[in-house]
Amino acid sequence: ERGRTEIDIPSVYTRDGRTGNRPTENRLTENTPTGNERTNSPTGNERTGNGRRSYLPAIEVEFEPELTGYYWKRSGMLNIQTKRGCPYECIYCSYPHIDGQCVRTMDPEIIAENILRAKRDYGINYLFFTDSVFNIRPEYNVRLAETLIRRGTNVAWGAYFSPRGIDAEQMRLFRASGLTHIEFGTESFCDRTLEAYGKRFTFGDVVRASRLALDNGVYYAHFLILGGYGDTREHVRETIENSRRLEYTVMFPYAGMRIYPHTRLAELAAREGVVAPDDDLLAPAYYIAPDFDLEEARS
């Protein structure tokens, strides 16, 4: 039976990460506005050092020495953020709630310095920028790419991109700075479904962005959500048909949408009776459109 999930967690501390190295207890006793800092005691009493009044204008970044070698040795890649926050309103996504909708960027010089240090100390040659969407704040992205080139990082990188908000000049610059592959959070190749999902681009944007990647020798993939809110059999057929217009790509299709708290999808799912309004959603719950047929999509 779904509902409230009982878990035993003695305390919770949340804040805008990478705000420095002062101990947690100092941040709670000093009233410095570094973001959302909160503890919940076992008795249920909440102690707030700083309510989230605003977000940091910039985020610090540094590879943790004790973890860098471990992850590089076992995975062959490292991850790093260049910005935090997402201004988009995709109905299923929890990033705007977790990271905020205010975009905060990291100093390109510090990013380059960390990459060079990791390359020198561990021999890394590939990393992934884990921004929710890389190609927002285009002026910043240009500055970052130019910094990577100027500092001679010479490390291949990939990132999550939106199909909208990238032009030929930027793609060439990113490629010169080390971009080797893109993962597009496309979700559908049908404009009607894209609108239902809260996307701000069209299939025409998808075709153009894919062509830009192909023309610049950048590998690219598209993630797809079939049977999400507003999707139908007809829309799925259109997505499958349109997929044939994209060349030399990889597609990752998923069936249904995971319902996360504080999203538009959670509100819609509760309204339709898919989940209860007070469901904490810690146990996974999924929305699958009534008109979606998984077996038909597979065939």
Residue ranges, per PLM feature:
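Structural recognition of alpha->loop->beta junctions
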Residues: 1, 176-182, 238-254
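Glycine-rich beta-alpha loop elements in corrinoid/cobalamin-binding modules
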Residues: 1-18, 49-50, 254-258, 262
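Acidic/polar loop patches that form or flank catalytic/metal-binding clefts of enzymes
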Residues: 6, 156, 221, 250-255
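Long, intrinsically disordered low-complexity tandem-repeat segments
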Residues: 19-48
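Radical SAM [4Fe-4S] cluster-binding motif and immediate context
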Residues: 57, 61-221, 226, 241
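Flexible glycine/acidic-rich beta-alpha junction loops that bind and position SAM and/or redox cofactors
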Residues: 88, 139, 192, 196-197, ...
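Short, electropositive alpha-helical surface patch
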Residues: 142-148, 232-249
